[in-house]
């Protein structure tokens, strides 16, 4: 009986690992491709309404975090992304949250609720209508895109753990 339970547990864990690996195959296929120039979208504004230009972060590794307050998977992923920020920002990695919210108050509330300290920008438009989602090929959130210091896409993914592994490699060199 114990052997059977162990077998089921191992099978379940293996299935979860496979499911996790397959999430990029399922949800990240339309994201910008590695090696391409990161699109420079001119319509993003900070939570205070100031214009944001991605090129202002040139020279640094940047993690773009596409999310929304109304997105259950984003809320589930938020603590992990906050931990990545807390770990890698002191090492020079910049994080930019790109919200797909249309309601600024809901956006502000989620930022406070999850203790998000990194820069937040948005177009305050419906997800599929935003220039930034179109430019980056974002059809699913949360999505993350890691950009190198030269403005090239290193990693498009829906898995924060992949971002963590890449940042660990980049900062340990």
Walk through the language-model features, giving the residues of each.
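Conserved redox-active cysteine motifs that mediate thiol-disulfide chemistry
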Residues: 58, 66-83
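A short beta-strand-turn-helix
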Residues: 42-62
């Amino acid at each position: 009986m114990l052997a059977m339970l162990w077998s089921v547990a191992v099978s379940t864990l293996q299935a979860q690992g496979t499911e996790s690996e397959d999430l990029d195959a399922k949800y990240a296929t339309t994201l910008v491709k590695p090696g391409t120039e990161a699109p420079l979208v001119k319509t993003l504004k900070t939570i205070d309404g100031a214009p944001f230009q991605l090129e202002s972060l040139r020279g640094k590794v940047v993690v773009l975090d596409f999310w929304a307050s109304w997105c259950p998977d984003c809320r589930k992923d938020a603590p992990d992304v906050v931990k990545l920020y807390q770990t890698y920002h002191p090492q020079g990695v910049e994080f930019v949250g790109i919200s797909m919210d249309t309601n600024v108050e809901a956006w502000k509330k989620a930022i406070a609720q999850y203790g998000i300290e990194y820069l937040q920008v948005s177009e305050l438009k419906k997800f599929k209508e935003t220039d930034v989602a179109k430019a980056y090929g974002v059809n699913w959130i949360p999505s993350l895109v890691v950009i190198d210091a030269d403005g090239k896409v290193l990693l498009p993914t829906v898995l924060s753990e992949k971002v963590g592994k890449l940042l660990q490699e980049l900062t340990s060199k």
